[in-house]
């Protein structure tokens, strides 16, 4: 089923259909992001139409990658909730987002630390928080999530070192053993606390 049709059927954060007599089957290994999109829509009421994110009270843009051609896509206008959802569509974890003729996933594939985008927006001071994972060793590549995360890390390294140099303040919290799939409340609270500690250490 094309993703444009698949998205119409997404109902839950984790969409796991029952297929008669065959038990539970996960569609294409993807997690539906409909509930996340609904949450973003509630949080961004008033910014659902075609708006320039650069004119928001706090100017904003985010980065996605187009699976059709592999190119970086800077999202700085349109539907704010949809842009946010597109930029966090981690390959192999969340389903891609169809936007016009593009199939968008997490921008980490093309630009995993987009300080250059902030610089282009006119930022005077850049505080970069790096939550990328260290590359895993062979014995640590055991699950689909770990393999996809490793591939994403490789693909997003093209600009990585140069973009670190653009930071006025560079913060890298300790995120071990957490990953992009760490969504529990306990995981999130722990990561926030580690981020605060890393920032205060600067």
Predicted segments with their positions:
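Patatin-like phospholipase
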Residues: 1-202
């Amino acid at each position: 089923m094309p993703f444009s049709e698949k998205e119409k059927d997404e109902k839950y954060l984790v969409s796991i259909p029952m297929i008669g007599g065959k038990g539970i089957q996960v569609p294409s290994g993807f997690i539906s992001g409909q509930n996340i999109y609904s949450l973003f829509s509630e949080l961004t009421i008033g910014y659902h139409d075609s708006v320039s994110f650069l004119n928001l009270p706090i100017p904003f843009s985010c980065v996605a990658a187009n699976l059709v051609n592999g190119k970086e896509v800077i999202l700085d206008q349109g539907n704010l909730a949809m842009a946010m959802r597109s930029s966090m569509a981690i390959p192999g974890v969340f389903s891609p987002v169809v936007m016009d003729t593009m199939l968008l996933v997490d921008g980490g594939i093309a630009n995993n630390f987009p300080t250059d985008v902030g610089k282009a927006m006119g930022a005077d001071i850049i505080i970069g928080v790096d939550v990328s994972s260290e590359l895993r060793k062979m014995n640590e590549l055991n699950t689909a999530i770990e393999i996809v995360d490793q591939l994403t890390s490789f693909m997003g390294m093209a600009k990585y070192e140069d973009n670190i140099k653009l930071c006025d303040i560079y913060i890298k919290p300790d995120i071990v053993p957490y990953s992009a799939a760490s969504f529990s409340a306990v995981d999130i609270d722990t990561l926030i606390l580690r981020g605060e500690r890393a920032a205060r250490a600067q």
